[in-house]
């Protein structure tokens, strides 16, 4: 391996010498200096050029094979392009080395500056890429935003629950399990979030659920399922979102969080499924006890339950009337005329009755203006009553007439009568 100092070298001449006989390295070097001396004058004399540093050390790699000698000659040059070419051509005039006939052929002239330029270009690209990655404007913006969002976490209520700054101002809130979940949602720009912080549901969460639309967002594990069930028992939950199985909310990416929240389902469906599962467990326990007692059971006729395409349980209609399909008490007869008046109108209309006053509004108007009514004698709804509507209206009235009712739970003080019973 030839090692050269290329500090001032511009070109390297590569030549090959073949001698018909056995020669040694010093013979080749002597031939190079001896046979080129005086050919081009003092300006291009190899000895003079070496003294002035314009030509570097001449290296020779010699191999002797089958009575012949093959030498690879390397000449570093700091001359210009023309002078280097002349010097290379001069080497080809060598015809003898010692007593042997020889020929020299220039193989290549390498431009060192070209290689350096190529190296500079490639290295500059690498450095630029590194600089661009280190000074990524988007990354800086995200880091600044994240630091601001991290600082937005507040302590809410007497229990000092971790929450986002928009819990009070937003009409709906997202309830999560812990502080880390709140921080992760804040990083994603979601500010109407509050944490339960423990297994016991704080009173602050219960009170918020009465005034706001609540989405519960829990981990995809057993613990998340237990917290969800407790929240469903004590809070007015509207929607439920779950992290993917085995994952926690705090470790989800922004894309995963948004996907989970978009896939939220009404709490009524979860409650219906819980009731269905509980019924199955109770039936199994009962059967096991009877079997252990040795009593023969009569096969059970199971009611049909309609399952929708997305595995949501369709809650069957619940007719909540005081008469249990018996004739209605006379006190309700006065509402028949209102029913006949309402069915002539379009669906989703509501008739509000307060003494002698009657008012026809849409369901949406009724929901939005509930606070305008202190109490209502009766409400007749030309449509289906849902659990959400019951939860909103039961504090304003204790009598509702409707086409149909699909609910999970009915307040004790509320009488709910369908048009079928009213018109019987």
UniProtKB/Swiss-Prot annotation:
EC number: 2.7.7.101
CDD domains: TOPRIM_primases
GO MF terms, alphabetically ordered: DNA-directed RNA polymerase activity; metal ion binding; poly(A) binding
UniProt cofactor note: Binds two Mg(2+) per subunit.
Leading EC class: transferase
GO CC terms: cytoplasm; DNA-directed RNA polymerase complex; exosome (RNase complex); primosome complex
Domain of life from the UniProt record: Archaea
InterPro entries assigned: DnaG_primase, Primase_DnaG_arc, TOPRIM_DnaG/twinkle, TOPRIM_dom
Binding of Mg(2+) 1, residues: 177, 219
Record-annotated Toprim domain positions: 171-245
Residues making up the signal peptide according to the UniProt record: none
GO biological process, one term: DNA replication, synthesis of primer
Binding site for Mg(2+) 2: 219, 221
Complex and partners: Forms a ternary complex with MCM helicase and DNA.
Physiological role: RNA polymerase that catalyzes the synthesis of short RNA molecules used as primers for DNA polymerase during DNA replication.
Family affiliation: Belongs to the archaeal DnaG primase family.
Protein known as: DNA primase DnaG
Species of origin: Methanocaldococcus jannaschii (strain ATCC 43067 / DSM 2661 / JAL-1 / JCM 10045 / NBRC 100440) (Methanococcus jannaschii)
Gene: dnaG
């Amino acid at each position: 391996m030839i090692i050269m100092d290329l500090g001032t070298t511009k070109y390297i001449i590569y030549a090959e010498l073949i001698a018909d006989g056995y020669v040694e390295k010093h013979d080749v070097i002597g031939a190079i200096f001896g046979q080129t001396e005086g050919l081009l004058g003092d300006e291009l004399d190899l000895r003079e050029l070496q003294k002035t540093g314009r030509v570097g050390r001449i290296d020779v790699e010699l191999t002797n094979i089958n009575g012949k000698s093959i030498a690879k000659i390397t000449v570093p040059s700091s001359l210009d392009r023309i002078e280097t070419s002349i010097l290379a051509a001069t080497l080809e005039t060598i015809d003898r080395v010692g007593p042997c006939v020889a020929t020299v052929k220039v193989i290549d002239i390498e431009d060192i500056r070209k290689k350096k330029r190529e190296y500079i270009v490639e290295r500059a690209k690498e450095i630029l890429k590194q600089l661009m990655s280190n000074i990524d404007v988007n990354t800086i913006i995200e880091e600044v935003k994240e630091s601001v969002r991290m600082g937005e976490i507040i302590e809410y209520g007497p229990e000092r629950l971790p929450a986002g700054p928009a819990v009070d101002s937003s009409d709906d809130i997202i309830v999560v399990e812990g502080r880390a979940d709140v921080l992760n949602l804040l990083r994603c720009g979601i500010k109407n979030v509050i944490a339960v912080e423990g297994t016991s549901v704080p009173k602050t969460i219960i009170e918020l659920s009465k005034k706001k639309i609540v989405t519960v967002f829990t981990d995809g594990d057993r613990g998340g399922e237990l917290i969800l069930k407790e929240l469903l028992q004590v809070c007015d939950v509207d929607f439920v979102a779950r992290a993917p199985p085995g994952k926690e909310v705090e470790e989800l990416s922004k894309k995963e969080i948004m996907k989970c929240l978009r896939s939220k389902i009404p709490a009524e469906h979860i409650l219906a499924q819980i009731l269905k599962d509980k019924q199955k467990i109770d039936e199994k326990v009962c059967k096991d006890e009877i079997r252990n007692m040795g009593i023969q059971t009569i096969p059970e006729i199971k009611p049909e339950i309609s399952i929708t395409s997305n595995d949501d349980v369709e809650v069957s209609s619940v007719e909540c009337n005081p008469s249990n399909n018996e004739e209605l008490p006379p006190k309700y007869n006065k509402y028949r005329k209102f029913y006949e008046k309402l069915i002539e109108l379009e669906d989703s209309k509501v008739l509000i009755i307060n003494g002698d006053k009657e008012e026809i509004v849409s369901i949406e108007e009724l929901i939005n203006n509930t606070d305008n009514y202190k109490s209502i004698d009766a409400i007749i709804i030309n449509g289906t009553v849902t659990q959400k509507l019951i939860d909103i209206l039961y504090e304003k009235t204790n009598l509702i007439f409707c086409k149909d009712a699909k609910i999970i739970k009915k307040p004790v003080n509320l009488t709910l009568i369908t048009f079928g019973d009213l018109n019987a």
